[in-house]
C-alpha cells in the first residue's frame, strides 16, 4: 500500500531529463502569493535553461502607485526595481521576471500558465484569455478554495480548464507567501495528471516550482490537492473554537485528526481522490497543521468564542476585509451535503457551519467527536462482583 | 483503500453484544497514567455490568506516605479515599477500583491485564506474575516506547507476551494523564489482533477503555500503535530544534509530515504495520501533533538550541530527572538502523540522533528535508530567450 515517498515524483533529477522543447512560463497574478510564485518560476527558468525559456511574464493588474515620491505605474517600477513594492515589498525577484500589464500577452506567450489570482477574479481573467492560448499549453492553479454552485463543487482548476480548453493542474501546500518569499523552507504538493495528448512530463512541471527552499512533490490526485487547501480552513475553525474554550492539546489533536479524516472522506466520496494525499502530503496534513496553529481562520474562531463578537465583525477587525474562508467554505460544503443527503456523514464540517451560521454552542463540538451509538450508554449497571 | 472510520472498530455498540462471560479487569501500575487508566476501567466495569465484573484490582507498589498528618500505607489511603493522593491527587476514582499491594493477586484474579508501569520495571513485574495467570487471559500494554537490544526492536507487548505466555495488545494515543483524569475529551487507539484461540472480542476490549471523554478506536495493527508512541518523541525533538531556531510554521509542518512518514516507513518496513495507522489514528498523527506542541521532548530540544546546554543538563532542569525519551529512542533506532544498513532511509530520525549525540548543527536539518538528488543543481544555466 502506501509508504514514504511512494506517492508522487519530485523534480530532484530534472537535469537528467532531456525535454522535447524549452517552455515559456507565464504567471497570471501578482499579489503577494503571485509575486512569490513568480520569483520561484523566474529562478527555475534560469536554473533549468534547457527546460525553460528564461523570460517569465507576470501579469500585473496595472495601478498607479507612489514610488520614491513620484506617481508611477506598478509594472514599470517592478521592471526597474525587480520588486513588487506594493504587494511583496522587500523581496527581490530575478530580473528575468517581467511584469506585463496585458494578460492577453501572457496568454499568447506561455506554454505553462500559472494562475495565482483571488478566486473571485478567475472567471473574468480567463474570459480575457480565451482564444489566445498556445497549442499544447497547460495551466497550474495556485488558487485555494472551491467553487460551489447548484451543480455542485468545482475545483478552480476545472473552471480554468473549461474556460480555456486546456488541461489544468493544481499547486497547494503549507505555504505562507511571506515565508516562501523569504526562502524559509517549506514543502508543497502539485496535482498533475494530464491526458495522454499533453506532452509535458510531470517532472518538468515540478521543476517550474521546486527550489531548495520550496520542495515539491507531484501526485496524480488533482482533486485531493485542491480540496486540501479549501477544506483545511473549516477544520482550522473547529480547532480555533477549541482554543477559545481553552481545551487541552489532546482534544485539539483529536479535532485535527477527525477533521483530516473528513477532508479525506469528502475528497474520496465526491471526487476520485487518493486517500493518501490528504493524510500524507503537504496539501493535506501539513497545511492543516500550519493553519491550526494560529492561521487566520483559527484566530478568528478563537476570538469568536472568547469575545462573543460576530464572525463578520471579527473578519473586519482581524482580517482587514479578507474573507474568512473557513466559515464560507463550511456553508458551501453544508449546502452541497444537503443536496447529497450526507450531512450526518460529516459531523465536524457540519458543526463548524452550525456554530458559524446557526446558534450551535461551540462546547457541543464534544458531542460531534463521539462515535455514533445505536443505544444510549448503560451507565450504572450491575455493581456487584 | 482507506477512509474515515473504515479502519478499526469502536465500543459504541457494546451493549448490543452479548458476551460469553463477565471478565475481571486488573491494572498493573498506579502512577499518574496508571491511576487515570484504572479510573476509566472502574467506570466501565460498572457501566457494562454484563461484560465485566465490577471490582477492578489495581496493583500499587506499596509505600508509606504522609496523609492528614499520619504515616499511612498508600493502598489503605486509596481504598479509603478512592484517590491516589500521591500520584494523581485531586481525582476521585470509582469505589470499585481497589488498590492491591500484591501484584500476584492481580495476576490471579484478572482476565484482562492492563500494564501501565514505567518500561524499566516491566520485566521484573512480569517475573512475579509468571505461573499465576488465568487461562484465556489477555494483556493490554499502555507502556510507550520500544525495547531495543542486539536482537532488534521489540514492543513491550511482545515482552509481556513472552514472559507471561499470554496474548498482549497495545493502547496508545494523544493522551496526557492529567487531561484524561480530568475527563477532557481525547481519543486513543488500541491495537488488538489476537490469535483465534483467544475468546475475547475486540469490542469488549475497546469497552474496557472507551468513555464519553476517552474515545477508543481498535485496530488490528499492534505494531503501528506501539511504535507511534515511541517514534513520535524523535520527531517532536526535530520540531523542537526548529522551534529553537525560530523557524516558521510551514517549516515545522514539513518536519512533522516527513517525520510522520518516517514513522510509517519504520513500522511498515520492520513490522507488519498497516500504513494507515500512523497517518490516520490517534496513536500516530494525533499523538505526534500534541507532542510537537510543547511536549517534553519538544521543550528540551528547543532549549537545547536556545541555551546551548547539554541534553543531560536539560533533562535534569526541565524533566526533573525523567529520561528524555526522544533522544534515547533516536539512539536505539540509529543503532538498529546501522545493523540493517538503512540509516540513509531515515534521514530525519538520523538527524535527531546526530544532533543529540554527535555534533551535527541543528540548522542542517534543512538539508535532511531536501529530496535526494543524483546530480547537483545546474544553477545559473542559459539565461537568454
Ligand atoms: O494557506 C495558508 C498556509 O498554507 C494560510 O493559512 P491561513 O489561511 O490559515 O492563515
From Swiss-Prot, chains A, B:
InterPro entries: 6-PGluconate_DH-like_C_sf, 6PGD_dom2, G3P_DH_NAD-dep, G3P_DH_NAD-dep_C, G3P_DH_NAD-dep_euk, G3P_DH_NAD-dep_N, NAD(P)-bd_dom_sf. GO terms for biological process: cellular response to osmotic stress; glycerol biosynthetic process; glycerol-3-phosphate catabolic process; glycerol-3-phosphate metabolic process. The modification Phosphoserine is found at residue 376. Keywords: Cytoplasm, NAD, Oxidoreductase, Phosphoprotein. The active site is at residue 232. The modification Phosphothreonine is found at residue 382. Substrate binds at residues 144, 296-297. Belongs to the NAD-dependent glycerol-3-phosphate dehydrogenase family. This is Glycerol-3-phosphate dehydrogenase [NAD(+)] 1. It comes from Schizosaccharomyces pombe (strain 972 / ATCC 24843) (Fission yeast).
Amino acid at each position: 500500500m502506501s509508504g514514504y515517498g511512494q506517492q508522487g515524483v519530485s523534480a530532484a533529477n530534472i537535469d537528467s531529463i532531456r525535454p522535447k522543447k524549452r517552455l515559456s512560463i507565464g504567471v497570471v497574478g501578482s499579489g503577494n502569493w503571485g509575486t512569490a510564485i513568480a520569483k520561484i518560476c523566474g529562478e527555475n527558468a534560469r536554473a533549468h535553461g534547457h527546460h525553460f525559456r528564461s523570460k517569465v511574464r507576470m501579469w500585473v493588474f496595472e495601478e498607479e502607485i507612489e514610488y520614491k515620491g513620484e506617481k508611477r505605474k506598478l509594472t514599470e517600477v517592478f521592471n526597474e526595481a525587480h520588486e513588487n513594492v506594493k504587494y511583496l515589498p522587500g523581496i527581490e525577484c530575478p530580473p528575468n521576471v517581467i511584469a506585463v500589464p496585458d494578460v492577453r500577452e501572457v496568454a499568447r506567450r506561455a506554454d505553462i500558465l500559472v494562475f495565482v489570482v483571488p478566486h473571485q477574479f478567475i472567471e473574468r481573467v480567463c474570459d480575457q484569455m480565451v482564444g489566445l492560448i498556445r497549442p499544447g499549453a497547460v495551466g497550474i492553479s495556485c488558487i485555494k478554495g472551491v467553487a460551489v454552485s447548484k451543480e455542485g463543487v468545482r475545483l478552480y482548476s476545472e473552471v480554468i480548464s473549461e474556460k480555456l480548453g486546456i488541461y489544468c493542474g493544481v499547486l497547494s501546500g503549507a505555504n505562507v507567501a511571506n515565508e516562501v518569499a523569504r526562502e524559509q523552507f517549506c514543502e508543497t504538493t502539485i496535482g498533475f495528471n494530464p491526458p495522454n495528448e499533453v506532452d509535458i512530463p510531470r517532472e518538468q512541471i515540478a521543476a517550474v516550482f521546486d527550489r531548495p527552499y520550496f520542495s515539491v512533490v507531484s501526485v496524480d490526485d488533482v482533486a485531493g490537492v485542491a480540496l486540501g487547501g479549501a477544506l483545511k480552513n473549516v477544520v482550522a475553525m473547529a480547532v480555533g473554537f477549541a482554543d477559545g474554550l481553552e481545551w487541552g492539546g489532546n482534544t485539539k489533536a483529536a479535532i485535527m485528526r477527525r477533521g483530516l479524516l473528513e477532508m479525506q472522506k469528502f475528497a474520496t466520496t465526491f471526487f476520485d481522490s487518493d486517500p493518501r494525499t490528504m493524510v500524507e502530503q503537504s496539501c493535506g496534513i501539513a497545511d492543516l497543521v500550519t493553519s491550526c496553529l494560529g492561521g487566520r481562520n483559527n484566530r478568528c474562531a478563537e476570538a469568536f468564542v472568547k469575545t462573543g463578537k460576530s464572525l463578520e465583525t471579527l473578519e473586519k477587525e482581524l482580517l482587514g476585509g479578507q474573507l474568512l474562508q473557513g466559515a464560507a467554505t463550511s456553508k458551501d460544503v453544508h449546502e452541497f451535503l444537503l443536496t447529497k443527503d450526507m450531512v450526518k456523514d460529516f459531523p465536524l464540517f457540519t458543526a463548524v457551519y452550525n456554530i458559524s451560521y446557526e446558534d450551535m454552542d461551540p462546547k457541543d463540538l464534544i458531542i460531534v467527536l463521539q462515535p455514533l451509538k445505536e443505544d444510549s450508554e448503560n451507565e450504572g449497571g450491575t455493581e456487584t462482583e
